[in-house]
C-alpha cells in the first residue's frame, strides 16, 4: 500500500476521533493508538528524506488537530507545537511528530536486519555485502570530508538511506553511535526507544531555549511552569479507568491542556478584575513590568484570597482525600483531619492525615501543601531548579511541625505538590514507603507506585484547573454593575445619589405613582443580606458565578 494511502487512512481516523464528545478520550486515543499506527511504516521507509515532506506535513497536521480542538485555537505558536510533540516525561503531550520518529525507526530496523539476516541465512552471502553494519556505515561517515559525501559508494539503496539517516541523527544527537554499538539492544523496539530518547533530549533543550527567550528576567514564569510540568509524566498518559482518573468536564481538561502548552486560557483584551481579591488588570508585579492579572491563570492559582477558598476546596482537599485512599490501599491505618496530635507543642494544630503501620508504634503525621512555582518568591529559582517551590513548601512545613513531632517520637512528612505536577522529596519518600508496604516484589512495587502517582498527578492538575476557572478575572464592567447593585440595596440618600440612571430607575421616576409616593414617610429598608435573595439567580456560567461571589464580598465588606 502506498505511503500516501496509509496517511489518508490516518487522516480519516483523526476526523472520526473529533466526533468523540469527551476531549480527554480524544487525547488518550490519539496518544495511545493513532500516533503508533505509523511506527511500523517508518521502520520500512526512509521517512526522514525530503521526498516524504508532504506526507509528513499532512500527518503532523492530523496530530495537531487534537490540540487545536481542545484549545479552540486554529493557529498554534511554534513553541506550543514543539511542546505537544515532546514526550509526557519531558513536559509535553506525547503526540509524536513524523520527524521525531522517522530516522530513529528506520535506523533501528536497518541495524537489526544487518545483524540478524546474515546469521539466520548464512547461505545468502549477499546479505552481508548489501547490508553493512551500522559500525561500518559510521566509519565511512567519519572518514568522509566534512560537508561532503562518503568516499565509498553504498552497496545498496537501503544502506544509502541508512547512512543518510544516521548522519542526520548524529548531527542532532552525537551519542547515537554509542547506542548502536552497545550489545544490550536486542530488539528494534528497544533500539528505537533509546535513540529516540537522545533525540528527545536535544529537542527538550531547544524548547527550553525558546521558552527562556520569551521570558523576562524579572518574572520568568514560563520556564518555572515548564520545569514543574516536566515532573508530571502521568496526567496526559493515563487511560481513564475510574472516577479519579476520568475528567468529565471538557472545560477543565482544556485548561489543563493550555497550561501544559503555555497558552493563554482567556484573552485579557478588556479591563478585568479578580473576583477574589478585586485587583485590577492594570496593577503590575513587584520589581517587574508584568501585570498581576494574566491570561494564563497564574494569578488565579496564587491569589491570596483563593488560598482559603477554591484552592483549598478544589485542589488541596482532593489531594488529601486521594492520598488517604492510597495509604489505605497500602495497608496503613489512616485518620483524616486529626486535631491535637501534638503531645508537646501549640494546641489546636490539625494534621491533614495521620497514618500508622499495622502493629507499629510510630505515627506518620502528614500535612499536605500546595505550591505554585510562579509566585514572585519562587519564580526565579523555579525557573532554574525544577521542584524548588515544592522544596520550599516542605521546609515551611518542617519548621512548623518537625521539631514537635520528632520530640514525641513520631515521623512527620510534608507532602508538597506544585501546580505543574512536580512532587517534593517528602512526597516521593512517602509514596515509596506505601509501595514497599503494599508489595514485596519489584513488579508489585512499580505497579503500586505508578497507580499512586497517576492519581496524585491527575487530582493535582484537575484541582489547578478548577481553581483557575473559579477565580478567573471577570470584566471590570461587571464590578461597576456590582457597585451599582450594592448602592441600590443600601438605604439613605447618600448611596442613592450615586446610582446611574438605568432603565429601571427611569421607569420609577417617570411613573405616575411616583408623585404620590414621594410625600409618604420613608419605610425602613431591610438589611442588604436579606435583599440578596430578591436578586435573580445567575446563569450557570463562570463569569456570572464570579459576579455573584463578588456581590456577596462587597456586601459583607461594607
Language model: regions and residue ranges:
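Low-complexity intrinsically disordered segments
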Residues: 499-502, 514, 538-539
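Cationic, low-complexity basic patches in intrinsically disordered or flexible, solvent-exposed regions
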Residues: 507, 516-532, 544, 553
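Post-transcriptional modification and biogenesis factors for structured RNAs
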Residues: 511
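Nucleic-acid-interacting cores, centered on viral/eukaryotic replication and modification enzymes
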Residues: 1-508, 547
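Compositionally biased intrinsically disordered regions enriched in polar/charged residues
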Residues: 538-539, 546-549
Amino acid at each position: 500500500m502506498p505511503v500516501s494511502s496509509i496517511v489518508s487512512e490516518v487522516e480519516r481516523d483523526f476526523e472520526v476521533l473529533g466526533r468523540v464528545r469527551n476531549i480527554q478520550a480524544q487525547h488518550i486515543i490519539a496518544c495511545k493508538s493513532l500516533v503508533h499506527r505509523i511506527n511500523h511504516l517508518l521502520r520500512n521507509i526512509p521517512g526522514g528524506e525530503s521526498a516524504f515532506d508532504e506526507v509528513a506535513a499532512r500527518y503532523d497536521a492530523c496530530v495537531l488537530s487534537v490540540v487545536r480542538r481542545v484549545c479552540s485555537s486554529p493557529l498554534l505558536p511554534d513553541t506550543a507545537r514543539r511542546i505537544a510533540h515532546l514526550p509526557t516525561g519531558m513536559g509535553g503531550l506525547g503526540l509524536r511528530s513524523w520527524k521525531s520518529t522517522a530516522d530513529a525507526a528506520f535506523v533501528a530496523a536497518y541495524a537489526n536486519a544487518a545483524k540478524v539476516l546474515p546469521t539466520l541465512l548464512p547461505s545468502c552471502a549477499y546479505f552481508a555485502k548489501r547490508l553493512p553494519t551500522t559500525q561500518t556505515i559510521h566509519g565511512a561517515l567519519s572518514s568522509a570530508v566534512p560537508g561532503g559525501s562518503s568516499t565509498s559508494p553504498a552497496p545498496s539503496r537501503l544502506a544509502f538511506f541508512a547512512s543518510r539517516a544516521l548522519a542526520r541523527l548524529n548531527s542532532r544527537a552525537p551519542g547515537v553511535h554509542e547506542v548502536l554499538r552497545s550489545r544490550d539492544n536486542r530488539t528494534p523496539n528497544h533500539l528505537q526507544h533509546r535513540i529516540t530518547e537522545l533525540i528527545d533530549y536535544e529537542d527538550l533543550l531547544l524548547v527550553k531555549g525558546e521558552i527562556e527567550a520569551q521570558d523576562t528576567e524579572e518574572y520568568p514564569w514560563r520556564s518555572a511552569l515548564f520545569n514543574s510540568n516536566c515532573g508530571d509524566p502521568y496526567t496526559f498518559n493515563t487511560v481513564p479507568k475510574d472516577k479519579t482518573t476520568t475528567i468529565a468536564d471538557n472545560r477543565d481538561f482544556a485548561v489543563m491542556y493550555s497550561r501544559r502548552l503555555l497558552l493563554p486560557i482567556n484573552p485579557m483584551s478588556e479591563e478585568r478584575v479578580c473576583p477574589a481579591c478585586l485587583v485590577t488588570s492594570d496593577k503590575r508585579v513587584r520589581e517587574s513590568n508584568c501585570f498581576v492579572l494574566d491570561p494564563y491563570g497564574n494569578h488565579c492559582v496564587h491569589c491570596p484570597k483563593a488560598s482559603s477558598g477554591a484552592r483549598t476546596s478544589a485542589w488541596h482537599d482532593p489531594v488529601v482525600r486521594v492520598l488517604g485512599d492510597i495509604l489505605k490501599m497500602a495497608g496503613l491505618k489512616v485518620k483524616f483531619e486529626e486535631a491535637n496530635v501534638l503531645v508537646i507543642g501549640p494546641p489546636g494544630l490539625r494534621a491533614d492525615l495521620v497514618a500508622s503501620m499495622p502493629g507499629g508504634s510510630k505515627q506518620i503525621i502528614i500535612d499536605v501543601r500546595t505550591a505554585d512555582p510562579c509566585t514572585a518568591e519562587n519564580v526565579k529559582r523555579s525557573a532554574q531548579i525544577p521542584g524548588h517551590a515544592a522544596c520550599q513548601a516542605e521546609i515551611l512545613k518542617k519548621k512548623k511541625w518537625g521539631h514537635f513531632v520528632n520530640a514525641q517520637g513520631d515521623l512527620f512528612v510534608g507532602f508538597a505538590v506544585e501546580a505543574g505536577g512536580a512532587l517534593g522529596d517528602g512526597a516521593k519518600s512517602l509514596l515509596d514507603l506505601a509501595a514497599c508496604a503494599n508489595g514485596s516484589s519489584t513488579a508489585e512495587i512499580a505497579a503500586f507506585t505508578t497507580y499512586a502517582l497517576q492519581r496524585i498527578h491527575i487530582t493535582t492538575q484537575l484541582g489547578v484547573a478548577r481553581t483557575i476557572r473559579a477565580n478567573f478575572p471577570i470584566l471590570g464592567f461587571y464590578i461597576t454593575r456590582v457597585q451599582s447593585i450594592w448602592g441600590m440595596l443600601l438605604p439613605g440618600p447618600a448611596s442613592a445619589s450615586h446610582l446611574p440612571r438605568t432603565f429601571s430607575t427611569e421607569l420609577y421616576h417617570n411613573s405616575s405613582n411616583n408623585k404620590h409616593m414621594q410625600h409618604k414617610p420613608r419605610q425602613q429598608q431591610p438589611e442588604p443580606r436579606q435583599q440578596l435573595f430578591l436578586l435573580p439567580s445567575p446563569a450557570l456560567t463562570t463569569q456570572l458565578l464570579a459576579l455573584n461571589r463578588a456581590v456577596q464580598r462587597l456586601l459583607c465588606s461594607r
